[in-house]
UniProtKB/Swiss-Prot annotation:
Designated gene of the protein: rimK
Designated name of the protein: Ribosomal protein bS6--L-glutamate ligase
Residues that, per the record, bind Mn(2+) 1: D248, E260
Role this protein plays: An L-glutamate ligase that catalyzes the ATP-dependent post-translational addition of glutamate residues to the C-terminus of ribosomal protein bS6 (RpsF). Is also able to catalyze the synthesis of poly-alpha-glutamate in vitro, via ATP hydrolysis from unprotected glutamate as substrate. The number of glutamate residues added to either RpsF or to poly-alpha-glutamate changes with pH.
GO cellular component: cytoplasm
Gene3D superfamilies with a match to the protein in the record: 3.40.50.20, ATP-grasp fold, A domain (3.30.1490.20), ATP-grasp fold, B domain (3.30.470.20)
Primary enzyme class: ligase
PANTHER family: RIBOSOMAL PROTEIN BS6--L-GLUTAMATE LIGASE (PTHR21621:SF7), RIBOSOMAL PROTEIN S6 MODIFICATION PROTEIN (PTHR21621)
Keywords: ATP-binding, Ligase, Magnesium, Manganese, Metal-binding, Nucleotide-binding, Protein biosynthesis
Residues annotated to bind Mn(2+) 2: E260, N262
Residue numbers binding Mg(2+) 1: D248, E260
Length: 300
């Protein structure tokens, strides 16, 4: 097969691993910067061009689209989809997952347990917002934040009001969540491929922090997950329409709670911790689904 990887930086670990895994299985691979793609949208002959040339047909496209380029990155991916390429995560699913409010609404509608969450845009009644999620301590987030950026733990009501007021000055959308103290600064990252959790790690925050993101200095170890955690991770990914997802779960006293679903999970931390060839599993999924029948169904 001919496979395109959409990424701004082909030297990143995840891109290199996906390229290696695909080539090892005999596929042709090209890494394309989605921001350098430009499109001819034409009912007679739509096409995608890249750095002065018209791109050929790709059997499959692997999107590694960062949150900062979601709009144009998913637009480029849609063009590949319209031309019959199989997407490992559809553009609509990526857009859905990147909208934190929309994704939480969909997960809640499906009965998936979440931390108690409130969301507002520059709330005038800060005290009621805090009360709505059960009071302090609580976590205040910028809706547009990633990798632990724009996330603050407010341990008292006064601190929570100060943080919310500060975020209000940014004219930003604010997400307020209950703080799960019993998780002790740890979460479980489940890597879902299709209908299976192929690997799971526990991520714990460094001393003095509560954010478990590996980019923020968190420490990872192999996790043994329960059947319920496995089922919740798979259901969360499927609810958002994702074939590949990183599902972050908090272990609360009342049971596992889904904190976030990542549409473009990094592979480095989880592969190096578990030793699982996740990139290979992703390529195998493509091999099973990027079939001639798929291209005919789409119209490619």
């Amino acid at each position: 097969m001919k496979i395109a990887i959409l990424s701004r930086d082909g030297t990143l670990y995840s891109c290199k691993r996906l390229r290696e895994a695909a080539m090892r299985r005999g596929h042709l691979v090209e890494i394309l910067d989605p921001l350098s793609c430009y499109m001819n949208i034409n009912p007679a002959a739509s096409s995608i061009h890249y750095k002065g040339r018209r791109l050929p047909h790709y059997d499959a496209v692997i999107p590694r689209i960062g949150s900062a380029i979601t709009f144009y990155g998913t637009a480029a991916l849609r063009q590949f989809e319209l031309l019959g390429s199989y997407p490992l995560n559809e553009s609509v699913a990526i857009t859905r997952a990147r909208d934190k409010l929309r994704s939480l609404q969909l997960l809640a509608r499906q009965g998936i347990d979440l931390p108690i969450t409130g969301i507002a845009h520059s709330p005038d009644d800060t005290s009621d917002l805090i009360k709505m999620v059960g009071g302090a301590p609580l976590v205040v987030k910028l809706v547009e934040g990633t990798q632990g950026i724009g996330v603050v733990l407010a341990e008292t009501r006064q601190a929570a009001e100060s943080v919310i007021d500060a975020f209000r000055g940014l004219n930003a959308h604010i997400l307020v969540q209950e703080y799960i103290a019993e998780a002790k600064g740890c979460d479980i990252r489940c890597l879902v491929v299709g209908n299976e959790v192929v690997a799971a790690i526990e991520r714990c925050a460094k001393a003095g922090d509560f954010r478990s993101n590996l980019h923020r200095g968190g420490v990872a170890s192999i996790a043994t997950i329960t059947p319920r955690e496995r089922d919740i991770a798979i259901k969360a990914a499927q609810t958002l329409g994702l074939d590949v997802a990183g599902v972050d779960i908090l272990r609360a006293a009342r049971g596992p709670l889904v904190m976030e679903v990542n549409a473009s999970p990094g592979l480095e931390g989880i592969e190096k911790t578990t030793g699982v060839d996740i990139a290979g599993r992703m390529i195998q999924w493509i091999e099973r689904h990027a079939t001639p029948e798929f291209c005919l169904k789409i119209g490619g």
